[in-house]
Amino acid sequence: MLTGPRLLDWSESPLISMYFAVEDWADKPNIDAALWCLWPTSLNQNANIVDKVEGHYIPSFEDDELQGYTVDSLRQNTRLELFPVATIATRNNARIQAQMGTFTIHHNKKIAIEDVGDHSHVAKYIIPHASKEALAEELKLLGMTRFSLFPELASVGAILKDMMK
């Protein structure tokens, strides 16, 4: 049963997703990581969000299809339980742009993404703990760093702190 946040972050970039999967390699050296892949239109079919014309439609936060997922709607319709949906946001801030961010929104129905429907909308790849450090170093060579994904001033401080260790 899901007890976590209603809004989950995803990225359109597999490299960015891999960064987040292995970034804690030093803090959790003996724990395997996981890389999750989501097929958003397949997930949305479970919530009956389908565009028969476009076929691969993903709603944005402002679209009518997501009105039932607003905080006000959830408060007013406590007995209504809808499946999670994949959505896109306006990329109007540097972090969402840098991370190529997308989201899934959970409704009152407490269900993990991987437990929705026939499970064909998601895949989980296990990254052995012994591979996490090497993958993190390779991603750094490709420009996947904390600052490139969190382009705020606070990231500079965190990077300098790490360099001083």
Model-assigned labels for residue ranges:
Residues 1-165:
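Catalytic-core elements of nucleic-acid end-processing and repair enzymes
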